[in-house]
C-alpha cells in the first residue's frame, strides 16, 4: 500500500457576454515521495496540516496562472474562497513559512502586473477586527492602557462588554443590499511579512448576508478597479443565489469522484 496525498484544485473561468465556453476542470497533484510527505516533521507539523498549507500556496499559483492566461479586454476578477490573511503562517517556523508565503506573494504580484483584481470572499465571517474599535468608547480611562489600569482583571475590564459582538452584527443594521461599509486596514501581525501586499477589508451586503471582502492594497488604491471588482462580486452572488457561483463551482470541480 502506497502512502500518499492528493491535492485536487478546482479551476473555473466563467465568461459573460463573450460567447466563450467556460473552463470547468481541476488540477490534481499527488504527493508520495518521503521528502514531500515528511519534511514538515522537522518543524513539528503534522503531514495533514502541511498538505493543507501546500494547498493554499498551490491555489494561489494556479489562480494567478489561470487568470493571466485568459485575460481579455473585458473586466476580469480573480476570486479566492476565504481570507487573504493566512493566520496559520504566524505560528510556523521561519523555514516552513518560507516554503509557503513566497509563492503566494509571487502569484499576487503576477495579478497586480496584469491588473487583475484579487478578492477574498468570506461568508459567515466571525471577525471582530472593526468592532474592536468600540472598546475605546467603553474605556473610562484617559488613555487606553490595559496593563496600567486593568492589571490582573482582564475578565472584568469595562470594554469586555463588546467581546461577543461581531463585525457582521454591526453592519447588518447599517447596510442595505448592494451597499458596502468603510474600508479597514487589517492589523494582523502576519501582514508584516506581506511586504507591499497589505490587506484591506470591508463588509458588503450581498442580499442574503453580510460578506467580508478582502483585497490587497493595490486594488484599493485603484478606485475604478475596486468598484468594478465589487460589482462583479455582487453579480456572482446573484447568479449563485446567495453565494458566488464561480467559487461554488470550483468546490464541485475539486471533489474527487469515482468512475
Positions of PLM-derived features:
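Acidic, metal-ligating active-site segments
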Residues: 1-37
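Long, contiguous domain-sized segments
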Residues: 13, 36-77, 82-259
Amino acid at each position: 500500500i502506497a502512502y500518499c496525498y492528493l491535492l485536487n484544485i478546482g479551476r473555473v473561468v466563467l465568461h459573460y457576454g463573450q460567447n466563450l465556453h467556460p473552463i470547468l476542470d481541476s488540477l490534481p497533484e499527488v504527493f508520495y515521495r518521503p521528502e514531500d510527505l515528511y519534511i514538515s516533521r522537522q518543524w513539528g507539523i503534522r503531514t495533514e496540516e502541511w498538505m493543507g498549507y501546500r494547498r493554499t500556496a498551490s491555489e494561489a499559483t494556479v489562480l494567478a496562472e489561470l487568470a493571466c492566461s485568459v485575460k481579455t479586454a473585458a473586466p476580469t476578477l480573480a476570486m479566492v474562497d476565504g481570507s487573504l490573511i493566512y493566520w496559520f503562517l504566524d505560528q510556523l517556523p521561519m523555514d516552513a513559512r518560507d516554503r509557503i508565503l513566497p509563492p503566494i506573494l509571487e502569484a499576487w504580484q503576477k495579478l497586480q502586473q496584469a491588473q487583475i483584481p484579487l478578492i477574498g470572499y468570506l461568508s459567515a465571517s466571525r471577525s471582530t477586527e472593526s468592532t474592536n474599535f468600540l472598546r475605546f468608547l467603553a474605556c473610562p480611562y484617559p488613555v487606553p492602557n490595559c496593563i496600567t489600569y486593568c492589571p490582573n482583571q482582564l475578565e472584568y475590564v469595562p470594554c469586555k462588554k463588546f467581546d461577543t459582538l461581531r463585525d457582521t452584527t454591526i453592519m447588518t443594521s447599517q447596510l442595505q443590499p448592494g451597499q458596502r461599509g468603510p474600508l479597514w486596514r487589517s492589523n494582523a501581525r502576519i501582514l508584516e511579512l506581506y511586504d507591499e501586499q497589505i490587506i484591506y477589508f470591508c463588509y458588503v451586503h450581498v442580499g442574503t448576508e453580510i460578506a467580508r471582502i478582502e483585497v490587497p492594497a493595490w486594488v484599493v488604491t485603484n478606485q475604478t478597479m475596486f468598484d468594478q471588482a465589487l460589482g462583479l462580486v455582487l453579480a456572482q452572488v446573484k447568479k449563485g443565489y446567495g453565494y458566488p457561483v464561480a467559487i461554488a463551482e470550483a468546490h464541485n470541480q475539486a471533489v474527487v469522484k469515482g468512475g
